[in-house]
Each structure stands twice: as structure tokens, then as C-alpha cells.
Amino acid sequence: MKNNYTSLKSPLDEEDELKTDHEIDLEKGPLPEYDSEEEGALPPYSDHALVNNPPNTHRENNPSRSTDNSSPFLIKLLISFTPIYVLNVLAICYLTYKDAFFKDYGAAEWTLFGFWCLVCTLALIFLTYFYETWVKAVKVTVISLAKCVKVISIGLFNIRREMMIIIWILWLIICCILFVYIKSGDLILNKALICSTCTISAVLLLIVSSVCIPFWTFERTLAKLAKVLLLQSGIVLVLNGTMFLRGKHFERIGCEIEASVLFIMGNVLFLCEMECPGALIRTRNSIRNGIAFILGGIGNAMMGLANAIRGANDNNDIPLGEMDVESEV
């Protein structure tokens, strides 16, 4: 029985196959001669050949390049020697400051010096041998500390207003303790320093809290402090000027009272100004309006009194005949 096989390919498909058989792959180059008689031989571009013979990698093409990524020995030795060198420099500076660097050394001192050299040598060997371990530990520690500092900084920035008040209250307590010691006679300070305690406390507050306060808040704080200081300066000038014109001066108790009043007033005004911006301006306006109201009331009373007196005088100037006519009517 004959097998009648009819190809399903069209003439156009057969022409395409012939063209592709004669085309050259630009990436692989021309096909080498293939000997089908050799056993196990496969075409060089077959998938099986590519799996069995993978292409050379960059590392295989460059066998002379080292695959070890660890640091060279000299760099390890130098980095390991750095902390020991810094520690020895600090020790030398301390001994020089104490004037005891290689001066009047006896047997005990030289023995201690030799032991120190032995410890430094062993530490250098240990750090060099376990270089990767302690470097990794240092990196982890530094990263952890950096994260802690970042978290603390963010927390302080978020509570900067509360931190200002806490620092201010702490400094108030310190100043009150100062006053107690001065009053008991255990501490002698200049009265001018006592009078300017609020200034010192404000400056310390600004220095300490400037780390966690934005610049615009810092600038506003300076402006409010300047207002408080101007007000205090005016009060001090008025009081001392008045006493000077009268030929008198404050005794110790008077200076303490003045200092206490200025201290309490300055701190209260500064806190009020920080808590309620514009408190000093509103206080000034309120005082001015109050004085104006009082003066206006006094003026109105004087005007009413003047009108009453003028009305009484007008009645006294009426002729007697007119008064009789008015009475008859």
C-alpha cells in the first residue's frame, strides 16, 4: 500500500525556509561545518550546547582580578592602630599636663609602662585579627545611636514649647535658691547681678533651647525679651532717679525688694508674652485706655461742675423785676 503524503506547506512557506537557512545570524556569526558522523555531536548553536557550555563570564575572562572583597592587611592594621594611637595621645597629654611624663620614673613606673606597651600590642593584634567583627559592631552601634539621636531630636522639636517652659521654671528655682543663699549671707554677690537675674535666666534659656526652637521662634523670643528688658530698665531708671534726686539711696533691704520685684515681674511678663503673644502691647493699650477713661471721667465731672456753676451764676444775674413776672406767671 502506497503512502500518499501531501505537504501542507504552501510554496511561499518553503521559500521562506530556504531564505532563513541561508541567512547568517549577525550575533552568532556564520554556522561552522557540522559533521553528523561524530557521535554525540550537536550543532554549535543548539540549546543543548548552550546549556552544557555556558558563555564565559566577566570574572572568567579576567582571572587575574582578585575575587576577595576584604580590605588589605595594611589598611586593617592602620584602622586597628588608630584607636590605640588616639588613646595614647590622650594619655600623653594628661601626663604632660600633670608634669609626670617620663619624669622621675622608678622601677614601678617602668614596669607599668612596659605592661602598658604589652597591652597596646595585644590590643593591636586582637583588633587586626577580628577586624571585620569589631568594624561591623561599630557600624551597627553608630547607626543605632544616629537613629536614637534622630528620634530624640524629633521629640524635642515637637515639645519645644513645653521644653522652654520647663527650662525656664528650673532656672527660676535656681534663682530662688540663689536669693536664699544671699539672704542667709552664705553667698555674696553684687546687687546689680541680682537685679539682672532675669536677664541672665532669659539668656541661658535662649542658649539652651535654641537647639530645638526654629529660628522664627528664636527671633520672636528675642523681641519679647527686649520688650521686657526695656520695661524693667524704665522702672529701674524711674526708681533710682527719684531716690537720687531726693538725695537718698536704697539700703540692703530696699535693694533686695527692688531685685525681687524686678525678677518676678520680668519672668511673669516674659512668660505671659511667650504664652500670649502681644500681651505687653495689650497691657500697654489697656493701661493707656484705663488712664484715658479715668482722665475722661475726671474731665466730664469737671465739665459738669463748671456747667453747674455757670448755670448758678446765670440765675444770679437775672433782674429782680423779671423774677417777679416769672413768679406771677
From Swiss-Prot:
Pfam family, one: WTF
Chief localisation class: membrane
Biased composition (Basic and acidic residues): 19-30
Position of the signal peptide: none
Membrane topology: Multi-pass membrane protein
Superkingdom field: Eukaryota
GO CC aspect terms: cytoplasm; fungal-type vacuole; vacuolar membrane
Cell location: Spore membrane; Vacuole membrane
Keywords in alphabetical order: Membrane, Transmembrane, Transmembrane helix, Vacuole
Transmembrane segments: 73-95, 110-132, 165-182, 192-214, 290-312
Gene Ontology BP annotations: meiotic drive
Region (Disordered): 1-68
Family: Belongs to the WTF family.
Assembly description: Homomer. Interacts with other proteins that exhibit high sequence similarity.
General function of this protein: Acts as a suppressor component of the dual wtf meiotic drive system, and can suppress but not confer meiotic drive by compatible poisons. Wtf meiotic drive systems promote unequal transmission of alleles from the parental zygote to progeny spores by encoding a poison and an antidote from the same locus; the poison is trans-acting and forms toxic aggregates in all spores within an ascus, wherease the antidote is spore-specific and targets aggregates for degradation by the vacuole.
Name of protein: Meiotic drive suppressor wtf21
Record gene name: wtf21
